[in-house]
Amino acid sequence: MPRHQNYSLSDEAAVQLVFRKYGVKVSAEQIAKAYAPEQKMSWKKSVEVARFIEGMTLRQAKSWLEDVVKMKRPIPIRTFKKKQAHHATPWSGWPVAKWPVKVARRFLDLLENLENNARFRGLDVERVVIVHAAAHKGYRIHNIMPRAFGRATRFDEQTVNVEVIAAELPQQVVPKRYRLNLVKR
């Protein structure tokens, strides 16, 4: 059971974010949100997937994540890439890439929820663009692993709170084809 459900952006802040990124004024009724609290998955991979799908349309993000689950297309790893295998850049110029299948499945469920929320609000799903995606650390589940000779080792499990905010944009602003943004942050 989730302990709390707090979006990091209010409706007014989401409207301002859309105006800053796309130069388009939208109302609060043109924004759809989805939140998945306390998911048992990797926080680092969740951050990379959230950063990657931000700026895509809903259809583009879902098709890319479905390809990740099928192990056809990877997710670029930009921040958490120390001691990772660097490939000979077969994927559009990023040497570090992974296929986070478990995280992609959870994000697909979240995007399905976002699509249903957008339909419920009466938005055109073809013009819905993900304007904000974030993964925050949730609480730790504390476990104990018994060891030999009466000892015990603490075994913690990290949870992740994931949020996605999307807005319906005018047709001329919606990205036709997603261009990979390879700028390092």
UniProtKB/Swiss-Prot annotation:
The entry's cellular-component GO terms read: cytosolic large ribosomal subunit
Report the record's Gene Ontology biological process terms: cytoplasmic translation
Q: Can the keyword RNA-binding be found in this entry's annotation?
A: yes
Instruction: One Pfam family, please name it.
Output: Ribosomal_L22
Going by the entry's taxonomy, the superkingdom of the source organism is recorded as Archaea
Tell me yes or no: is rRNA-binding among this UniProt entry's keywords: yes
Which keywords appear in this protein's UniProt record, sorted alphabetically? Answer: Ribonucleoprotein, Ribosomal protein, RNA-binding, rRNA-binding
GO MF annotation: an example: structural constituent of ribosome
Q: Which family does it belong to?
A: Belongs to the universal ribosomal protein uL22 family.
According to its UniProt entry, the function of this protein is described as: This protein binds specifically to 23S rRNA. It makes multiple contacts with different domains of the 23S rRNA in the assembled 50S subunit and ribosome. The globular domain of the protein is located near the polypeptide exit tunnel on the outside of the subunit, while an extended beta-hairpin is found that lines the wall of the exit tunnel in the center of the 70S ribosome.
Q: Which PANTHER family match?
A: 60S RIBOSOMAL PROTEIN L17
In terms of HAMAP family, this protein maps to: Ribosomal_uL22_A (MF_01331_A)
How does this polypeptide assemble, per the annotation? Part of the 50S ribosomal subunit.
Protein name in the entry: Large ribosomal subunit protein uL22
In its UniProt entry, the species of origin is given as Pyrobaculum neutrophilum (strain DSM 2338 / JCM 9278 / NBRC 100436 / V24Sta) (Thermoproteus neutrophilus)
